[in-house]
Design a protein with these regions (language model features):
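Cell-wall polysaccharide-cleaving catalytic domain and substrate-binding groove, primarily
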Residues: 1-241
């Protein structure tokens, strides 16, 4: 069970990873993407007529916030099932408009709620992964998860990576048949002892899977531009919180 202080540190690290810990970064539409990324966890929200290969998470967060009794969700969000902006240009043109300003205020005032949502996703991830993993993978994944989780920065790594690149169970999240989620990172770790050694190997395995993703990606997506940032993020997993 994570302490309140550990949760606070993890939430702030995720926010730092995704948008430099800035309030402005809580509503972002990245170059080359077809959707905005919202909140400390850069939760994806798809426009109405777009369905990408990545798991959409912003609507799930809003449902979670409602279940937790959040009273300050902007009314327009509750009435809008799909992202109302259809392009990065229209999104950025409205960056300081009433809707995005109210959304940033809500997100900035509910950092702990977003952290709890990310934690809940992470805690549910292992069970989902074991269901879809091959019988040969299951024990390796279970053991590696326990080894990594035995340190506070390892626990942060497991939580952050699920939020960052997903569980690895969505068959659409593949390039040339190869995934890059938590399943693939855990399954491809090299044999290592529990503790900091496991956290360091998780970091290294994550970088290897992300390098493979870049290698297998459509060159027109230009994913190589993300390599340095992705590696920097994975490097934080090997360092104490």
């Amino acid at each position: 069970m994570l302490s309140a202080e550990s949760k606070r540190k993890i939430g702030n690290k995720i926010w730092q990873n995704e948008s430099g810990g800035t309030i402005n970064g809580l509503t972002t539409w990245n170059v080359g993407e077809e959707f905005p990324s919202l909140g400390i966890g850069h939760f994806i929200w798809y426009p109405k007529n777009f369905r990408g290969p990545y798991t959409e998470s912003f609507p799930s967060f809003i449902r979670y916030a409602q279940q937790r009794g959040a009273k300050d969700i902007p009314a327009w969000v509750l009435k809008t099932p799909h992202c109302p902006w259809t392009s990065r240009v229209s999104f950025n043109a409205d960056k300081n408009g009433a809707r995005l300003t109210s959304l940033r205020n809500f997100l900035a005032n509910n950092i702990e709620l977003q952290t709890d949502f990310i934690l809940a996703k992470s805690q549910a991830a292992l069970g989902k992964i074991l269901v879809v993993a091959t019988p040969a993978q299951r024990e390796t994944i279970r053991q590696n998860y326990a080894k990594v989780a035995s340190t506070s920065n390892g626990a942060y790594a497991l939580i952050d990576y699920v939020n960052f690149k997903g569980e690895g169970i969505n068959p659409k999240e593949r390039y040339k048949g190869e995934g890059w989620g938590l399943l693939q990172v855990l399954a491809n770790m090299r044999p290592v002892a529990s503790g900091q050694a496991a956290a360091s190997e998780f970091s290294a395995s994550a970088k290897r899977r992300l390098d493979l993703r870049i290698k297998n990606s459509d060159p027109t997506r230009g994913e190589n531009r993300w390599r340095e940032g992705w590696h920097n993020r994975c490097d934080t997993y090997a360092r104490p919180l």
